Amino acid sequence: MKTPTSTIQTNAATATHGNLVSTSNANFSEHMDERSSVLTQDTQEFLTDLLNRQKTRLNELSSHLSSMAHSETFLSSLKSSMHWPVEELTCDKVVTLLTKLKDTDVAANSVETLIEKLKDSSRGILRADNVSSLDAIDISKQNDLLWKELETFRHIRGILESFLQTHYSKSSRLINQESVEVLMGQLLEHEKDNLRLREQVVEKETKVEDLLHLIQQEKDTAVKSNQVSRSTEATHIRLQNLVKRKETENQQIVTQIQSLAAVISGRKLEIEDLRREITHLKEKQTFEKEGLKKAFRVQKQKVDNFQDVMENLNTQIKKKETELSEVHSSCSIWKDHHDSAVETKTRLEVQHESLTKQISDHLKLIKTMDEEREQSKEENAEKISAIILENAHFSEENVKLKASIAALESETVLVNSELLEVREKASQQKHFAEQYENQVQKLQEELNKLKEKFKDVLTKKKEILENKASENKKVDTNDYFLGNESFKLENNRIERKCEEIRIKLEKMIMHNEQLESKLKGQERDLQRSEVELEGKAKECSTLMRLLENAVEAGNKQISEENNKVLSKELALQRKLQSLESELKRKRAEHKQLGCTLNAFEKTHNLRLEEIRHSLEMTESRNKSIQSYVQFLKTSYAAMFE
């Protein structure tokens, strides 16, 4: 196996020679006549491009654990060529700088190729079961070369940094300070990347040592597997028999599972049918409940309507009682009118009977005339004319009868209007009677008040007379004081008071006489009103009897209707009880069905779980057998290889 150092050196020499020739010719032909400022700009652009490319390549190297390699002769040549005297920048120096930078690019390419080789060798090591000592030595050599080339690359970068620092310190007028700082930062980043790459290389070395240790262990295990291979052949045959047996058992289990799946599908269909029946029963129950509720509401409404009807009947009975009281007062008048109407009706009925008899006679005559028509047409014509005249006479009589009927109808209308007037008069008389009663009560109260006032007046009169008698006595005893004018004035005043009291007494007596006359008139009116009230009371008693009879009849009807309603309610209650018993029975059946369904579902779920468990067990056994068979196959293949 060739070492990579010789190939890298040859490639680097050829590349540097060709690059030097090409760059020298190009630079001398193109830039000899141009200014130094243009050269510095070109170098700046070229350096930035190179640094960017180096940064990307270093990132790739860090991801793939790459490193660079270069020869020591190349390093010495770079050192000798890069130590320039500190002078002004010339065209030759720029050309040498460009060549050196291109040499570093070539070195980076060679490092990439070396990294790819190292990667391939590491993959081969990882894939191979046995690793030779030559490969291990080759890996260690390549690792040493990588370390050396990384150091050389770092040294080259240091030289370039020193050169660039000297160059940019001399040419600060041409190049901006910002680009220099950017380049320095990029160089620092590259140094950091190199340090990280070194750490990764150390880690990879430790991993390679671990891999070598593992390879040695695998060799030991291979020796042991050769010893075990003989025992595995017998086990392989035995396992093949077991596999065949398990395959037959699996087929049987599959058939059982299929049969169980068919049974489960049938049971599921039965469960669905039972659920449908349950839903149907629930719908029936809800429908029957709604029907019962509706019937109960209808019966309630009927009872409420019946109660309203009863209340209306009571109000109507009360109204009828009042109307009967009014009608009873007008019955006598109505009876007279009715008797007259009956007489006219009887008279009209007699006339109608006579007319019907005449019509029947005329019909008989018409029949006879029809029979005699064949004998004499002329006689028939004369008779027909006579009949027409008689019919006209009868039509006139019918018109008269219609007029009399219309008159009777008008009379009935008048009678009805008179009845209404009589009712109104009766109501007015009732109102007047109530007013008279109120007036009588007021007059009685006034009489009581007047009697009390009269008694008070009499007591006052007695007191005044007693006072007068006492004063007369005083006057008799005190005659000797009459000479005095003051006593005279007092006597005059007392006499005036007495006269005023007498006038008041006379007025009171006159007023009492007037009140007594009014009371007598009012007593007469009261007697008359009492007589009228007694008559009305009798009428009211008769009306009350009639009303009581009507109320009894109404109560009988109400009791009958109540009995009917009670019988209907009892029937409804019986129906409700029967329906409730049916509902209870259906609910019990529903509960039983639910319990059976739950038990069936539980058993079904338990069976499914058992089947799944058995399937999982069989699958795990099959997998273990397959894994063991695979292990045997691999072990046999490794042994025979």
From Swiss-Prot:
Q: Name one GO cellular component term.
A: centrosome
Location in or out of the cell: Cytoplasm, Cytoskeleton, Microtubule organizing center, Centrosome; Cytoplasm, Cytoskeleton, Microtubule organizing center, Centrosome, Centriole; Cytoplasm, Cytoskeleton, Microtubule organizing center, Centrosome, Centriolar satellite; Cytoplasm, Cytoskeleton, Cilium basal body
Q: What processes does the entry annotate via GO biological process terms?
A: cell projection organization; negative regulation of cilium assembly
**Any coiled-coil regions, as ranges:** 83-144, 191-270, 299-375, 487-599
Q: Please indicate if the UniProt record lists Coiled coil as a keyword.
A: yes
Q: Does the keyword Calcium apply?
A: no
Identify the keywords attached in UniProt to this record, alphabetized.
Cell projection, Cilium biogenesis/degradation, Coiled coil, Cytoplasm, Cytoskeleton
Q: What does this protein do?
A: Acts as a suppressor of ciliogenesis, specifically, the initiation of ciliogenesis.
Annotated family: Belongs to the ODF2 family.
Report what the protein is called.
Answer: Protein BCAP
> What organism is this sequence from?
Xenopus laevis
